[in-house]
C-alpha cells in the first residue's frame, strides 16, 4: 500500500537522505556501501536527471532549487512568527521540501521475494511502483496562491529508494520490501513557471495509487505462477504461508498494534504516531547476519517461502485458463459504477478506478480498466460534470442519475399552483393565532403551509426551532379539512418523533416498498404526507416516493439543508429548493435557553462557522487538551460529575468507543454503574459495504453475521433470521453461511436481496449503564439510535432497559436474540441529529479525517444543547478552520436559477 508522510522540511529531508534512505545498514540490496536511489517523474527528465540520486542534487531540490544550477525556483515560506528576547517579531523561513510516499509490499510478498529469493517478485514490485507513480503524477497540481484554484500540471520530480527490511525490534530487522519516494515540493505550470506543489491532490490520489500498485503487482505475480488471495485489508497476499509464520516475521507490525491497543486509538494517523514512538535504535548488522536471521525463522516454520516459490515455478508452466478478459473488465467497471453512484451522484474518476481495480484484482491491468471506462464515457453512459476549477481529476455522473434528478424537479414544478388550499387564509390565521406561545416564525409557517396551492412544498427548519409543535398544529388543520395525515422519514427515530406529534408515521423505505399506511383506509381519499428529515433522503427515495402519491395528495417536505445529509446519493431536498420549490422558513431558534449559546448556534446555523466558534471561545466553552487520552479522561470526568441530561458527541466511532469506555469506568468508580460486568456479543454494522459490495463474495469475511430481511425459500433461510459467514469462494462468487439451526448453506450473494452485514464484537455491560440501540426493533417499539438505561440484568441475561423520553417505558429483551445495542454515553454527530440534551460535551479533534470535522458537525453537535455546550479540542488555533470544511454532497444537475421553469435549463449548467 501507499502511505504519504506529513511534509518534510529541507533539513529533515536531507537528514533522512543521509541516514535513512541511502544507508546500507539492514538493507542487503545495495550498490557498494550505499543505496543509490533512482530519479522519477517528467520534471526529473526536464532537469536532465537520470540514474542514481546524487546527494547534492537531492539537497538542492529539497531547498526548492534547480538541481544543477542551484537557482531558487520555489520561494521559502514563513514557518511561524514569534517574539525574540528584545520583543521584536521574528519570521524564520524554512522550505517545505516535499513528502515521503512509501509503497510497501504485503508481508507474504516480501517473504517470497526476500526469503524465498525470487528476484522476479522484487522486479514486479519495482514495476508496480513505477506504474502507480506515473498515475499519481498525472494528478499533480500547482499551488497558485490567494483564493485562486490549484492548477493541474501532471508533472513532478521524485527520488526513489528501495529498502528490504523493517525497523528493528529487539535487534531483529524483519524482511519488508518497500520503496521510499520523496516527491519534491515543486511543479511546472503551462507558462513555464515553477510553483510549490498542492499536497491536497497527492492525498486525494493516495487510495487510487495504492489500488494501481496492488493491482499491477497482483497481475504480475499471477503471471509468475503465484496464487493470490485477498488479505484482511483487501491487499493481495501470496497463498501458502501460515499466520504464525507471518506474525513471527512481522514483529514491527505487532509492536505498533500493541501501542495502538494501549492508546485506544485507531486509524492511519494514530498508527503513524505509534510507529514513531516505538522505534528501536538503529542496529548495524551485515547483510549476511540479516539473511541468517531470516533463515533461522524460516527454518522454524518449515521453510514455507522456498515451497511457495518452487510451486509457483511449476504452476507457471501449466496453461492458464483463457478467461474472457473483456467481459471481466466490463464487469469490474459496472461494479465500480454501481458502488460509487449508490452513495454519490457525482464521483471522481479515481474512485471509480479504485473500485474497478479492486473488483478485478490480478485479473486485468489498469490500462484495460481505463480503456473500458473511456469507451463507456464515449457511449454516453457516464457524463463528465463541469468542475469549479480546482479538481485534479475529472468528475462523472451517469445518465440514469441525471434522469432521476430531472424527474423529481419536473414532478414538483408540475404541481405548483395547481393544488387546492388545505385551508383558506381566513381560517388559517385564527388557527395559528390560537397558539399564543408560538413565535412569529412558527405562526407564519403554519399559515404558509395551510394556504399553499402547491402540491409539494418545503419547510426549512433550523435545529431547535419548535418544529414538532408546528407540525402538530398543521396536522390538526389538515384533518379538520378532510385530509388523512401520514408521516414518513428516512430514519426510524425521525418517524417516531412524527408520531410524538400525533401523526401516524413510518419509515420512508416501508412506504416505498409497501405502498404506505393508508391511514384513512381509503386510497382515494386525499392525503397530506409529511416527510421529516428530508435532507437525509436520497434521490432514488425521493423519486420513488413522489411517484407513489396520488393526484389529490399534498406533500410537505421537512428538513434542514445545513444539518447532516444522507448516506446514499443525492440531495433532493436542497436541490428542490434551488429549483424553485416554495419553502416556508422556520428560522427562529427556541431550543437554547442561554442567550450567549443561542447567538453562537445561530451563527453556526448560518454557516458562519468561524464566528460561531470564536463566540464559543469567548464564552469560555472551549478547553484545549492536546493529548487524546487526557482529553478523553477529562470528558469522562465532566460527564460523570453531572450525568443527568448530558450527552457526549464525538466525530468518529473510534473516539466514541474510547470515550464510552472511559465514562463507564468513571461511573463504576463512583458507584453510579454497577461494578459487575456482563460480557455480551453485540453486532456492529459493516457500514463500509454498499449494495454492490453485498453481491460480491470477496467483500465478506469469515465471522461476519448476516441478517436476512427477506430470506430465501430456495436456501431455507427464514425472513428476519441471522447466519454467520463460514467461508467465501471468490473465484465462484459463493458464500457459505451457518444458519441459526446449525446447518450450512452456500449461495451466490448476487442472487439474494435484503441482506445486512455485521461484525460480532464483545462488550461489557452493567446495571445502570446507558445504552444506545443500533437498529430498529419493531417488537420492542425501539427506533435506531434510541437511548435508554439498563435497570436489571437477570440470571438468564434478560435485560430490562428504561427508555429515554417523556414516557416512562421499560423494554425487556434477550441480548442473545436482540444484539443491536452499544454503550450510549457518547454518540457520533450523525447519531445525535434529532436529539436534545441540557448539556452537551463535544470532542473536536482536528487530527481526525477532514470529512468528519466539518461545518455540519459543528452545527449539529453544538445545537443539541439547550443550556450548555462544552468543547474539548487538541488545537484551538486550527479548530475554526477545520470545522469550516464543507462536506456537502454534489448533485448531477445544478439548478442555478431558482425561478427556472424547466429542469433541462439546469442540466446545461452542470454537464459537459
What are these regions (language model features)?
Residues 1-912:
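Conserved ATP-binding/catalytic motifs of P-loop helicase motor domains
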